[in-house]
Amino acid sequence: MMKLFIIYLPAQCSPGRLKNISKKAISAACRKRNDIEAEYITAADEFCFLAGKGSLRKAKILFIAEIDEGGINLEACKILSYLQSHASSKPLTGSAGAIVIDGRGDMFTKDLGRRIAFAANIAGLSFPGKPLVEASEDLHNFRVLADLWDTDLYSAYEKSVLLLTDKLLDFEAASIKNTSSYGKQKILAVHAGNKTTSNSFNLWEMIRKNMEDKADIEDISIRNGQLIDCRGCKYDDCLHFGENAGCFYGGVMVEKVYPAIIDCDALVLICPNYNDSVSANIMAFINRLTAVFRAHDFSQKKVFAVIVSGYSGGDIVAQQIIGAINMNKNLILPADFAMIETAGKPGDIFKIRDIKEKAAKFAANITGL
């Protein structure tokens, strides 16, 4: 029997919209299956108690939250605090999750969604691609889907929550699918750092050494201005090029990156922290994925990240990658998807305590071995 936990966190003055939509979607999804046992959790204290007992492991977890006009849900904040402070005990190990956020304006829904995803991920939770449904107060963010499905905004919201619930119940956070003809996993690592001075690249080298006999690894460098950023072609033009694994602007993205990412089982982004963001080249790489993403299914690929900050903010960079690659580009977010370290001066990465052991552990997480 599969256990589904619905973490339902209404706002203090709830309009009731999310309650009606989520209950209808969950009931419909569960009726399709005869092996689901659903349980509602409506308070942070109850969530923390069950997590502490290990009851939230090897389950499906659907976070459903309303935010107030200030973008806050106090019960959600308590859960975030618990997950972040108990990450080392992995209270959500073996579980998979999805998120629905209902807002009182046009802002803050994605912010809370990404924060929940990151906190749950470091606590052991995996997410399928596109695991977030968010609703602005006027539901105008559902205009495109409403047109596509020939329906109204409310019905588009309702259908999105149902599809997300179905996706969660069907999702299995299994090890990376092997596509190599000789059985090894195909891993694509993308970086833009200087190999001699970059702490993030040196950390990746430590990780890589632990996987060389277990995976087929391809490294692609996109430094020194090789990559032109996305210029925002019309949708039809972008789709046309993407269907042919191309892009109007060509270059290393078309020649090397597109074929490699279509072929890989897992993507590893090596990301030094630049002003609490990925570097310009990595951001251009993410933007240019749009063409190939529109024509190819990334839902069976996983994303991992190696993040090194000189001062702080690695968690912010991790959330940026979650938003861009998992929530937007549809790649799976495996549990503990990011290795996050702080190393300021060149070579400082080697001075971190137990860094080789950490690198070996992260390599095992990537390969699933």
Which residues fall in each region the model found?
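Cysteine-cluster motifs in flexible loop/terminal segments that predominantly coordinate metals
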Residues: G225-Y258
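FMN-binding flavodoxin-like domain, especially the glycine-rich phosphate-binding loop
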Residues: M2-D45, A51-K195, N199-A215, Y258-D263, ...
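Hydrophobic acceptor-binding patch used for acceptor engagement in glycosyltransferases
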Residues: L267
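Redox- and metal-dependent alpha/beta enzyme cores, enriched for Fe-S-associated oxidoreductases
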Residues: M206-I207, E218-G225
